[in-house]
Swiss-Prot record:
GO MF annotations, alphabetized: rRNA binding; structural constituent of ribosome
UniProt KW rRNA-binding keyword: yes
Similarity comment text for this entry: Belongs to the universal ribosomal protein uS4 family.
Reported function: One of the primary rRNA binding proteins, it binds directly to 16S rRNA where it nucleates assembly of the body of the 30S subunit. With S5 and S12 plays an important role in translational accuracy.
GO cellular component: small ribosomal subunit
Subunit structure: Part of the 30S ribosomal subunit. Contacts protein S5. The interaction surface between S4 and S5 is involved in control of translational fidelity.
Single GO BP term: translation
CDD domains for the chain: S4 (cd00165)
Matching Pfam families: Ribosomal_S4, S4
Domain S4 RNA-binding, first and last residues per copy: 98-166
Biological source species: Kosmotoga olearia (strain ATCC BAA-1733 / DSM 21960 / TBF 19.5.1)
The protein's name: Small ribosomal subunit protein uS4
Keyword entries, A-Z: Ribonucleoprotein, Ribosomal protein, RNA-binding, rRNA-binding
Length: 208
């Protein structure tokens, strides 16, 4: 399955909540979900009743789109999570949240996960002082993430950092905005991650 390249705001409207795919726009009244809180298309405003399978599929699609992960990789993450000793939904969130592109986004060095993925793949991000250009790289507690010195002056990075200064820092991260550096202190707990997705329905879908 190829990566989606169409208008990302339509994805948020289809799910019925913000996936935070458009960067700073998602935090303003210009957000498509705020302006047009119904699904795209001719019959988008009509009420549609989904089957149980349909609801499970919607939950999976929403989580995949939020983190920018394709089906094959998402299934692998689910298999990893299902082998953990803790509850599968919680483990799945920890796996997704520890992706390097997501950590760069959570630290406020990029305005969206897509932009964070580009920063990583183009070699602008260091992990413990070494360049890592794999967006799916799994960050571990204690790892130090920073933007390369030459890349700190890039306009998208500077704009993202300035916009993030007034937002609440995730409790599992320590961030130095002036240095464009942060520490992944620990894995987040499920209740600390604001994701309006029914994780249990995803577990049921993959358990069939």
């Amino acid at each position: 399955m190829a990566r989606y390249t169409g208008p990302v705001c339509k994805l948020c409207r289809r799910e019925g909540f913000k996936l935070y795919l458009k960067g700073e726009r998602c935090f303003t009244p210009k957000c498509a979900v705020v302006k047009r809180p119904f699904a795209p298309g001719q019959h988008g405003s009509a009420t549609r009743k989904l089957t149980q399978y349909g609801m499970q599929l919607r939950s999976k699609q929403a989580l995949k789109r939020m983190y920018g992960v394709l089906e094959k990789q998402f299934r692998r993450y689910f298999e990893i999570a299902s082998r953990k000793s803790e509850e599968t939904g919680t483990a799945l969130i920890k796996v997704l949240e520890s992706r390097l592109d997501n950590v760069v986004y959570r630290m406020g060095f990029a305005s969206s996960r897509k932009q964070a993925r580009q920063l990583v793949s183009h070699g602008h991000v260091l992990v413990n002082g070494r360049k890592v250009n794999k967006a799916s790289y799994s960050v571990r507690p204690g790892d130090i993430i920073e933007i390369k010195e030459k890349s700190k002056a890039k306009v998208p990075v500077k704009e993202a950092i300035e916009a993030s200064r007034n937002r609440t820092t995730p409790p599992w991260l320590e961030i130095d905005f002036d240095a464009a550096r942060g520490t992944f202190v620990r894995f987040p707990e499920r209740e600390e991650v604001d994701i309006p997705v029914d994780l249990q329905s995803i577990i049921e879908l993959y358990s069939k």
